[in-house]
Amino acid sequence: MSRVAKKPVSLPKGVELNVQPGLVSVKGPKGTLTLPKPAGVEIAIDGGVATLSANDPSQIALTGTVRAILANMVKGVSEGFERKLELVGVGYRAAMQGKDLSLALGFSHPLVFVAPEGITLSTPTQTEIVVQGADKQRVGEVAAKIRGFRPPEPYKGKGVKYAGEVIIRKEAKKA
C-alpha cells in the first residue's frame, strides 16, 4: 500500500463522512462536499477515523490520491481554505460590487468577476483579494483565474500575484 494511503483520516467533531456505493460525501459546518468513489478503493469508518484500502493491486496509487482528496475535503468542511492575492501596480485596484469582484488592472474597462457557487470573495484593502471556500481545488482554480487576468511581469513586477509569491525579476536591456 502507498505511504499516503496508510495514514488514517481523522474526522473532527461536527464532520460526518457518508460512504455510499460510488459516492463519498463529507458534511460539516462549512458545507457539504461529494467525491465519486473509485471502484477499487474501500473506505472504512471506525470511531471518528477513516481508513482506506485497495481491493486490487492496480488501485494502490489511486488509494493514496483518494485519501489525500478526502483529507482535503474534511479540512475544507471544518476549517475551509483561503488564498490571498495582491495587486501590484499604479492604479491597480479591486472592489466588491455586491457579490461580484470589480478589477481595475490597466485595461480600458474594469473587469467584473462573478464568484462561482461555494466561493466567497472579499477585499480587505484595494490591493488585496481573499478567496475563501470549502473546496481546495475550486479555491485554487478561482485564484488562478483572477491571477490570469494580469499575471505579474518580470521587469517591474506589476500584475496580480499570490501573497508571498516571489517574482523573479529581469534586468532591462542595456543600451
UniProtKB/Swiss-Prot annotation:
Gene3D superfamilies: Ribosomal protein L6, alpha-beta domain (3.90.930.12)
Stretch forming the signal peptide: none
Keyword annotations of the record: Ribonucleoprotein, Ribosomal protein, RNA-binding, rRNA-binding
Domain of life: Bacteria
Keyword Electron transport: no
GO cellular component, as recorded: cytosolic large ribosomal subunit
Protein's UniProt keywords contain Ribosomal protein: yes
A GO biological process held by the record: cytoplasmic translation
Coiled-coil spans in chain: none
Molecular-function annotations in GO: rRNA binding; structural constituent of ribosome
Subunit relationships: Part of the 50S ribosomal subunit.
Role description: This protein binds to the 23S rRNA, and is important in its secondary structure. It is located near the subunit interface in the base of the L7/L12 stalk, and near the tRNA binding site of the peptidyltransferase center.
Record family assignment: Belongs to the universal ribosomal protein uL6 family.
NCBIfam families: L6_bact
Entry-linked PANTHER family: 60S/50S RIBOSOMAL PROTEIN L6/L9, LARGE RIBOSOMAL SUBUNIT PROTEIN UL6M
Protein's name according to its UniProt entry: Large ribosomal subunit protein uL6
Lineage: Bacteria, Pseudomonadati, Pseudomonadota, Gammaproteobacteria, Lysobacterales
